[in-house]
Amino acid sequence: MPAFMPRPHPSFPALHLACLCLLATPAALASAQLPSHRLDNDVVESRVSEVAGGRLLSFALKGKPNFLLIDEAAGDPAVAPDATSGYIRYQGHEVWIGPQREWWVHQDLNPARAAAKATWPPDPWLSLAKYALVEKKQGELVLDSPASPVSGIQLRKRYALVTGKPDSLRLEAEATNRSGKLAGRDIWFNTRVPAHTMAYMPVASQEDLRIEPSGALRYTLGGGLLSLDLPMPGDAPRKGKLFAQPSHGWLAAFRDGQALVIQFAHQPRAAIHPAQGQVELYQDAVADAPGKGMLELEVHAPYVELAPGAAMRASELWTIMPYTGPATRDAHLDFLRRHAAQLGISIP
């Protein structure tokens, strides 16, 4: 696999009128079980927690509902993770380390999971531990994970509002190999949204797709653009994952008056671990229970052989916009085409 690009250390200029503050009012604590910091520039607002894996808890246009699926009461963040920890479904946005089939094979703290080549749960030290607050300033937050004895990785996460793009948030992840030995890994962004969210991405052909389990999901592919179909009343529940090699570096999601566009560095297929896709959509949806299940919008960075102490970086740029049109594929794609130049995305 090709090596990843050297890691730069960009700084984010302070965004005028942006504020970063710890939510500590009684009203805030009543509505948010996890302690959090807020990034707010009067156009968008988001909340990030040091606990529960340095997780992004919310992102939305100012005054609009949270676009993310979140359950802040899912677990007790004061409980330190260990090698027997299960997964706690806080949801929101988090960063995993791939490939999934190697999650537990490089450690000896839990021999049973190593022997089984367990593919669940993800690394507890990266997903559940409290991160250290490295820096906070106007419009920016930097957090460090502990060094994980499971994956051998330490994560640094940076969340920052974007100068000149008041409707955008940049998410950066830096993964450093602390294992003391060569480690093949990738950075894996995972964003959870409610199950009835409609998702789109550019895909050239069906040869760039696979679904696991086979036949579990339905999609529409036309004109170089893929949409994941939602189950209709009377349809069987949908539960599975679509793996894709996108033709360009973006995906989009629409729900309840907001459109979220996630941009990332497009990679050749050879750069992505063969067990993964650069974009993966995990759907768990039941037509008659739209409040249940979820959709995961997942993006993989290149698979890299990291020397001890070496690091790799990846990022996503999130832009959220108001959307007042019909909840249909044609209307959504027309909206994306009309805003493509503004967003800086390529649409087939």
Q: Where are the regions that the model predicts?
A:
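N-terminal secretory signal peptides that target proteins for export/translocation
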Residues: 1-12
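Positively charged, low-complexity intrinsically disordered regions
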Residues: 8-10, 17, 102, 114
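Secreted/extracellular small peptides and ectodomain modules produced from precursors
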Residues: 10, 17-19, 88, 217
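Bacterial N-terminal signal peptides
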Residues: 14-27
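Surface-exposed acidic/polar loop and edge beta-strand patches at domain peripheries
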Residues: 31-170, 178-348
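Beta-strand-loop-alpha "switch" segments that mediate conformational coupling across diverse proteins
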Residues: 173
